[in-house]
């Protein structure tokens, strides 16, 4: 006998941390009245690794391999912000060629991140076919990364004052070929997805956020731009050499899950435009500021010196962070990724506060899912785009 659920007879359900749609180790405690969501409480911290404290016990160069583990699907952005802070504190000039290569890598990383958001998002909604097409394109981006950096993920490619290595011979032509191919791929996704009536039914009008509400919650990235706010740090902060390229900020005014999807799809085509312009106009010259190598360098050990046997153990070149405070930020695929850095006249930062976009964007989830159906939780959570590595840090 089925007893209808009344207002007093709520059901409490645990979603996660092993649920296939939870995008990592996220747990939601959901209170249900039948199919309607009454309340939702996210439980975080399953992937906490003490990243801020580790930073305070490492030099910047030693810490660089760690930062790729925050948002492990868009690692170029975490590397960029880690080197941008010391560069600003130390007034270190980045060569033009290195800046162009950084922009190319950042935009490729943005495309890879958006693709890896789109595939599982479609699978959560019930569309399996686009998932395989999307991963085919993402594989090509990872091939480009592997050719340039040696790694498909966790690239460890950015350095203070430049990058680790120049682009290999033939890489630029290969990347231009990918850009032409990918534009046809995006058109294919839009044919498959954007006007699909079942897809529209699942996302249109679901999880609406108004512009003022988005600002009050501190949202950033596609979450903010989908609510009618034209705010992109690449235009606002003028970092790297984005001002030298012709591109537009992508935004929508509806504020629902469909608008967030459209913003990300449009951003991928804008990223291709930026990459094509950067590849065609890439200047010659050095790919790193060679003066950085001379920081804090002890005299070279001599043949008969006791220290000579430890030559392979010599510390990495580093420099003292001046006694200053600095907040530095970049426009990551998920929003504003920032670091509040306090130097203390030593090689280690005194404080290293990470502002992860996913953590702040996730805070609005309980408000968005209230009074919605249980099945809408997947759509709304998927449209926020979170990675638990950077949420829990």
From Swiss-Prot:
Record-listed E.C. numbers: 7.1.1.-
The keyword Cell division belongs to this UniProt entry's keyword annotation: no
GO molecular-function terms, A-Z: NAD binding; oxidoreductase activity, acting on NAD(P)H, quinone or similar compound as acceptor; quinone binding
Keyword Secreted: no
Chief subcellular location: plastid
Catalytic activity: a plastoquinone + NADH + (n+1) H(+)(in) = a plastoquinol + NAD(+) + n H(+)(out); a plastoquinone + NADPH + (n+1) H(+)(in) = a plastoquinol + NADP(+) + n H(+)(out)
GO CC term, one of those recorded: chloroplast thylakoid membrane
Membrane topology recorded in Swiss-Prot or TrEMBL: Peripheral membrane protein
GO biological process: photosynthesis, light reaction
Keywords: Chloroplast, Membrane, NAD, NADP, Plastid, Plastoquinone, Quinone, Thylakoid, Translocase, Transport
Localisation: Plastid, Chloroplast thylakoid membrane
TM stretches of this protein: none
HAMAP family attached to this UniProt entry: NDH1_NuoD
Family: Belongs to the complex I 49 kDa subunit family.
Assembly information from the UniProt record: NDH is composed of at least 16 different subunits, 5 of which are encoded in the nucleus.
Task performed by this protein: NDH shuttles electrons from NAD(P)H:plastoquinone, via FMN and iron-sulfur (Fe-S) centers, to quinones in the photosynthetic chain and possibly in a chloroplast respiratory chain. The immediate electron acceptor for the enzyme in this species is believed to be plastoquinone. Couples the redox reaction to proton translocation, and thus conserves the redox energy in a proton gradient.
Record protein name field: NAD(P)H-quinone oxidoreductase subunit H, chloroplastic
Gene behind this protein: ndhH
């Amino acid at each position: 006998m089925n007893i209808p659920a009344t207002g007093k007879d709520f059901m409490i359900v645990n979603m996660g941390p092993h649920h296939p749609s939870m995008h990592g180790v996220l747990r939601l405690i959901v209170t249900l009245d039948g199919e309607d969501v009454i309340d939702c409480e996210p439980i975080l911290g399953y992937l906490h690794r003490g990243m801020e404290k580790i930073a305070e016990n490492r030099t910047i160069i030693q810490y660089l391999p760690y930062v790729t583990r925050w948002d492990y699907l868009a690692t170029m952005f975490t590397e960029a912000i880690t080197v941008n802070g010391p560069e600003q504190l130390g007034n270190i000039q980045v060569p033009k060629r290195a800046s162009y290569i950084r922009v190319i890598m950042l935009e490729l990383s943005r495309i890879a991140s958006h693709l890896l958001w789109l595939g599982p998002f479609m699978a959560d909604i019930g569309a399996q076919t686009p998932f395989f097409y999307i991963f085919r394109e993402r594989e090509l981006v990872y091939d480009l990364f592997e050719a340039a950096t040696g790694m498909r993920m966790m690239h460890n490619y950015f350095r203070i004052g430049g990058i680790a290595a120049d682009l290999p011979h033939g890489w630029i032509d290969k990347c231009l070929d990918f850009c032409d191919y990918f534009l046809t791929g995006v058109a294919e996704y839009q044919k498959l997805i954007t006007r699909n009536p079942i897809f529209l039914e699942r996302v249109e009008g679901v999880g609406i956020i108004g512009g003022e509400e988005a600002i009050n919650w501190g949202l950033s990235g596609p979450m903010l731009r989908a609510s009618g706010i034209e705010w992109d740090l690449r235009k606002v902060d003028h970092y790297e050499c984005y001002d030298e390229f012709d591109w537009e900020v992508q935004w929508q005014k509806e504020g629902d899950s469909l608008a967030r999807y459209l913003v990300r799809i449009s951003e991928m085509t804008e990223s291709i435009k930026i990459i094509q312009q950067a590849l065609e106009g890439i200047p010659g010259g050095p790919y790193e500021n060679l003066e950085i190598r001379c920081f804090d360098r002890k005299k070279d050990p001599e043949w008969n010196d006791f220290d000579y046997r430890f030559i392979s153990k010599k510390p990495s070149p580093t420099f003292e962070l001046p006694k200053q405070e600095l907040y530095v930020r970049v426009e990551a695929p998920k929003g504003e990724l920032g670091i509040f850095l306090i130097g203390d006249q030593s090689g280690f930062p005194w404080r290293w506060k990470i502002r992860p976009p996913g953590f702040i964007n996730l805070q609005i989830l309980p408000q968005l899912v209230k009074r919605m159906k249980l099945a809408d939780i997947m759509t709304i959570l998927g449209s926020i785009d979170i990675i638990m590595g950077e949420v829990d840090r």
